[in-house]
């Protein structure tokens, strides 16, 4: 068809949005059309050419009757009949999504049809909250984007166009009080109020900060708020720190003066009110309410004052409390303020795993007999189970939102972009009555704790790779995150059109390669959890943890039970994944396990590596291979594919190493060495890629394990390999013979068959009545009686299990009435043996994107 020369965008007067978000979205569409030399008219009546009719819920519209349009907040639809396009939205945000979808098609399209794509398109949100957090951590690097108004316009437009509905500007997250006191140097916005406000009557200020810069900071905050509102985005301001030891930070670059024990709470209260009044577009505030935010746990009086400051602004403002250390008394204090209340636990520790919520926390996260200290009485005491997951927040009758925060501990530098996993996060974000997800964006924590470097915000050292704005490298990442959180069934064309524009003939190779690559680090993180803290464990630029002993103790020793070695690191799902040590113990005992083994993980990683390698092989023969975007994508795919090979070999080596540690048998040394050698070879290959592309010192913190690059990690791995090879001649092991039990363990290890799953199995019931027995039945053949594993959806509790009974060609078990009588929903899975293989129902699908358990909601 011939490209049209004129488009009319018809906005009926009854929409009542002449200056608001719909008008902004219409202008976005008009601008995209004008960039393609199309004349555009926006008005109440069409003036010829293609007509884009904008219609809201309850309005008469053509060409379709709209009968199938979902009556749900944020729903949108596009219909087309010839030269007439209907852009429908249930509400303002739905209309914004409809119009920006058309604008995106115009911008990314390359054919004659300006609006080429899926028609009709009807979409509605799965995750109610879809938030993106941007952290200010480094004055040297972050002022660059904070003061850049055009950057904000472009960035917020990108978020709104990709169906995010909330933006969270996050201040004060760079340090954890009091643990990081010795490291405190860059405190810009750490205690944020005096960097934004002059509060009469308190005498609190920042010595080195001019009044002009302080006022400029506040003006920029107000600008960001207005630009969010203009695009229909909620504006969340995260205030993570309420105090630190202002008089005991000799390395700090700014001095906060005038804070006393007596004036801290009223000052924070009044500053919160002043911020909310000066920036009326702020729709919510996030607070870290455990000791790391500066307020000792149990000091509820401070929070009564702070939340009163929120209420004093005179409008509804959501009080969002970070989950760690959160107790129900704190929730009640927030509730009594009269404001909307939310809790934001971590999705999977301070990292990123596969999309499902971990079945169980690490043993280290269950509450101890006594708290570490009085000021940590909750986060390191009675509420420790909330440290890194949803804890006991998902009660049947909760009256607060639960919004998961996906921290940037796993991956910060390399590209991510798997539509399958992104859709999985969209589905799991609503787990058991939850409300959504907030992502910490790529490059979060860049330059924190005083490690910011001018000119290194973009990580690249090779010329031509850095993008115009820091976030643009991750444009595709935001696209798949946002659109598939909104609608996990979004059409493939919604991300492929961007790849086709940027990558040409390599669009499909880039899609497939990046999809495989994006699963690598989430899986490694889940199966290998030496530390839940992003301050100590960075899987992306991995600090080596030795197979026997040696490297890694300083990074990981505080957060895992010793001995500190690779095979002894726990998993982040103790109910469904076994560590190498646990697996070796089972092999030596001649037992099987229902859990996934390190060899299962290694097999998955090899599949991911093969997928990356196939995409790379395809790409290298294309004339589009040297385009900038494919080069950025494929370099990261090559690094991640190499990491998949490395960790696959490391998991295998760890199984042999754990058998060796338990038996000292010399015959185990060579298999262990073979896998360890292959692991190092894989890292050498990926380090060769990073050495040419990325800076030698990527700074995400001051400690050695939070900075460096892939090639800087290599010498430690090579040194460990030399140490392992020295075991050959070590007198204590060179002639130790094996035992019959070891022979069986070796045979089982060599002949290991993968754990099977039945992810397509359907749950017999989706709801239950509390206080009544809950029968569970499965139709399956098994060698022995299957085992039912069940638990309240409460991470403070351990899993229960019972054997199932054969009945009418299947198996049944009943969860007793006294167990179902609780405030919580239930989850369960079944384990069994079939043809000599462990089997889980439902277990994980081959793409790892589903929930490996059934969820049963209480009526």
Predicted regions and their residues:
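Feature activates predominantly on carbohydrate-active enzymes
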Residues: 2-8, 12-18, 23-28, 32, ...
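Alpha-helical linker/edge segments of TPR/alpha-solenoid repeat scaffolds
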Residues: 700-734
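C-terminal non-catalytic alpha-helical accessory regions
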Residues: 441, 445-714
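Aromatic-lined, polymer-binding surfaces characteristic
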Residues: 240-265, 278-283, 290-300, 631-648, ...
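Short, well-ordered secondary-structure micro-motifs within conserved domains or adaptor modules
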Residues: 40-69
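Glycan-association/targeting regions that enable binding to alpha-glucans and other polysaccharides
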Residues: 724-859
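Conserved, mostly hydrophobic/aromatic
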Residues: 91, 159, 287, 499, ...
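Catalytic-core regions of glycoside hydrolase
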Residues: 34, 109-110, 165, 177-180, ...
């Amino acid at each position: 068809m011939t490209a049209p020369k004129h488009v009319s965008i018809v906005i009926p007067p009854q929409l009542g949005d002449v200056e608001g978000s719909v008008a902004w979205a219409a202008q976005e569409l008009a601008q995209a059309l004008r960039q393609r030399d199309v004349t555009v008219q926006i008005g109440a009546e069409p003036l010829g050419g293609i007509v884009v009719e904008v219609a809201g819920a309850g309005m008469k519209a053509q060409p379709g009757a709209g009968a199938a349009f979902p009556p749900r907040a944020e729903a949108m639809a596009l219909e087309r009949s010839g030269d007439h396009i209907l852009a429908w939205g249930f509400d303002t945000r739905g209309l914004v999504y409809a119009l920006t979808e058309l604008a995106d098609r115009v911008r990314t399209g390359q054919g004659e049809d300006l609006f080429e794509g899926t028609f009709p398109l009807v979409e509605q949100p799965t995750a109610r909250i879809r938030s993106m957090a941007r952290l200010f951590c480094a004055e040297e690097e972050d002022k660059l984007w904070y003061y850049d108004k055009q950057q904000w316009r472009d960035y917020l437009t990108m978020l709104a166009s990709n169906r995010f509905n909330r933006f969270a500007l996050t201040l004060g997250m760079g340090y954890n009080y009091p643990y990081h006191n010795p490291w405190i140097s860059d405190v810009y916005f750490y205690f944020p109020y005096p960097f934004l406000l002059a509060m009469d009557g308190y005498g609190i200020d920042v010595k080195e900060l001019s009044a002009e810069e302080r006022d400029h900071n506040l003006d920029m905050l107000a600008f960001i708020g207005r630009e969010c509102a203009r695009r229909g985005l909620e504006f969340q301001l995260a205030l993570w720190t309420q105090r630190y030891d202002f008089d005991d930070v000799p390395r700090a670059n700014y001095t906060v003066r005038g804070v006393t024990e007596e004036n801290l709470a009223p000052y924070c209260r009044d500053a919160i009110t002043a911020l909310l009044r000066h920036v009326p577009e702020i729709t919510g505030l996030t607070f870290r309410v455990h000791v790391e935010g500066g307020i000792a746990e149990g000091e509820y009086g401070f929070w009564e004052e702070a939340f009163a400051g929120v209420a004093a602004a005179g409008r509804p403002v959501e009080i969002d409390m970070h989950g760690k250390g959160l107790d129900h008394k704190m929730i009640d204090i927030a509730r009594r303020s009269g404001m909307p209340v939310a809790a934001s636990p971590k999705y999977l520790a301070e990292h990123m795993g596969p999309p499902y919520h971990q079945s169980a926390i690490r043993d280290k996260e269950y509450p101890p007999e006594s708290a570490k200290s009085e000021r940590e009485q909750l986060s390191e005491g009675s509420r420790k189970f909330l440290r890194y997951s949803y804890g006991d927040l998902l009660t049947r009758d909760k009256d607060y939102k639960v919004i998961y925060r996906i921290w940037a501990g796993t991956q910060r530098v390399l590209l991510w972009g798997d539509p399958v996993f992104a859709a999985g996060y969209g589905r799991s974000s609503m787990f058991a009555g939850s409300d959504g997800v907030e992502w910490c964006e790529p490059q979060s924590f860049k330059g924190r704790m005083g490690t910011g470097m001018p000119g290194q915000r973009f990580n690249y050292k090779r010329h031509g790779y850095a993008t115009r704005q820091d976030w643009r490298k991750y444009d595709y990442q935001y696209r798949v995150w946002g659109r598939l959180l909104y609608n996990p069934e979004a059409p493939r064309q919604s991300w492929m059109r961007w790849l086709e524009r940027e990558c040409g003939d390599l669009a499909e190779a880039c899609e497939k390669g990046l999809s495989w690559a994006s699963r690598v680090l989430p899986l490694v993180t889940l199966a290998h959890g030496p530390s839940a803290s992003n301050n100590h464990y960075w899987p992306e630029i991995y600090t080596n943890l030795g197979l026997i002993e040696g490297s890694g103790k300083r990074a990981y020793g505080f957060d895992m039970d010793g001995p500190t070695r690779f095979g002894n690191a726990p998993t982040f799902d103790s109910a469904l994944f076994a560590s190498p040590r646990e697996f070796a113990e089972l092999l030596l005992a001649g037992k099987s396990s229902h859990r996934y083994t390190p060899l299962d993980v290694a097999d998955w990683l090899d599949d991911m590596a093969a997928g990356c390698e196939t995409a790379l092989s395809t790409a290298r023969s294309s004339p589009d291979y040297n385009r900038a975007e494919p080069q950025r994508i494929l370099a990261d795919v090559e690094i991640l594919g190499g990491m998949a090979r490395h960790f696959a070999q490391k998991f295998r080596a760890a199984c042999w190493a754990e058998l060796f540690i338990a038996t000292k048998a010399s015959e185990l040394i060579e298999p262990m060495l073979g896998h360890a050698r292959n692991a190092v070879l894989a890292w050498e290959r990926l380090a060769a890629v990073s050495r040419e592309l990325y800076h030698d010192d990527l700074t995400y913190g001051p400690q050695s394990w939070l900075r460096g690059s892939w090639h800087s990690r290599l010498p430690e791995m090579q040194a460990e390999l030399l140490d392992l090879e020295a075991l050959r001649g070590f007198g204590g092991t060179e002639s130790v013979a094996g035992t019959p039990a070891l022979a069986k363990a070796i045979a089982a290890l060599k002949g290991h068959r993968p754990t099977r799953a039945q992810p397509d199995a359907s749950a017999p019931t989706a709801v239950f009545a509390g206080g009544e027995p809950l029968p569970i039945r499965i139709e399956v053949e098994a060698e022995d009686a299957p085992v039912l594993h069940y638990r309240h959806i409460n991470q403070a509790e351990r899993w229960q299990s019972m054997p199932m009974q054969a009945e009418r060609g299947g198996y049944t078990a009943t969860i007793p009435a006294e167990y179902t009588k609780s405030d919580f929903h239930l989850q369960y899975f079944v384990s069994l043996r079939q043809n000599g293989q462990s089997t889980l129902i439902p277990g994980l699908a081959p793409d790892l994107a589903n929930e490996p358990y059934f969820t049963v909601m209480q009526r």
